[in-house]
Amino acid sequence: SDVLSDVCFGPMNQGKSREEAEEEAKKALLQVGFKEKNFKKSPFDLSGGQKKRVAIAGVLAMNPKILILDEPTAGLDPKGRDEILDQIAELHKVRGITIILVSHSMEDVAKYVERLIVVNHGKIAFDDIPKKVFAHYKELEEMGLAAPQITYIMHALKEKGLPVDPADTTVEEAKQDILHALREMNSSLLKGGVQND
């Protein structure tokens, strides 16, 4: 069996013809960044990242309304992890699929999700946008979860007097916020003038 046949399995089980299934499979494989030249490869000859892409494509070929992904980047290197998550975000945008991402990586969660639900001992502890959930970083720690590293850095900078938003959860947000704070501080220093002895 090859990759294309593997991905055709779901649509064919839904009653689609071989041609329809192949069309859906090819579309799904290309959407997850799987190159056409690899369609005829054996699934056993694929890298870890390629296998994850094929698995996601197999589900996408069935045109789901909701896609549940449990630790989809486990075992991948940082580059592969970012590629998979970028493609998942693109699928949400292009296809309008609701994606439920189960992850212990709070950096990934902060960067990619619109809504964050934290479950602790089978009960929902938090359900809000990431910024609001990560504001409770001390409670998250008590549950065995850490907020993104940038959350801790921003809180430390705020405590040291830098006028930043401690609710920043991504590196990009923090970078913009820190640059803005430094410009404001520099502007204040220039307005006040520098006294020489």
Describe the predicted segments one by one.
Residues 63:
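Conserved catalytic motifs of ABC-family nucleotide-binding domains
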Residues 109-111:
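A short, surface-exposed alpha-helical micro-motif characterized by mixed small hydrophobic
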Residues 121-122:
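Conserved ABC ATPase "signature" C-loop
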Residues 20-37:
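Conserved ABC ATPase "signature" region
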Residues 42-46, 50:
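Conserved ABC ATPase signature
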